[in-house]
Amino acid sequence: MSEGHDQARFAPRPRRQASNSHDRANLDAELELIRARIDTVTARGREDFHDGKETYDVACMVIIRLAALLERPEFEPHMEAVTQKERLAIRTTRNIAAHTGYRSMNDDLFWLAVTQRVPAILDRLRGR
């Protein structure tokens, strides 16, 4: 075989753009996982929600995963329902949970965010 023929034979195909429906399906699947985590937290109740408890860690994962979704460029077209103020609050809460530690977290505000505010955001995202 000639060198030119080998190059053409093994040339990579151009990447195809992922379909928007595939992105939407992936987003919906992740939103369902976040919702399931919220249900776990809510089912245990506020009295069992504090640093050191499993539900507190699950709630942190809710915020971490939601913040990650907001940072993914392929999901950006679907994120119009999330206000800039909400995005900032989610990022700030994620940073406290992931980097600063729970001691600086206000448990009452964190409970409210995970059990009321985030579900409202998820409802808006699912409606799009």
Residue ranges and their predicted role:
Residues 2-128:
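Solvent-exposed interaction patches of small proteins and small membrane subunits
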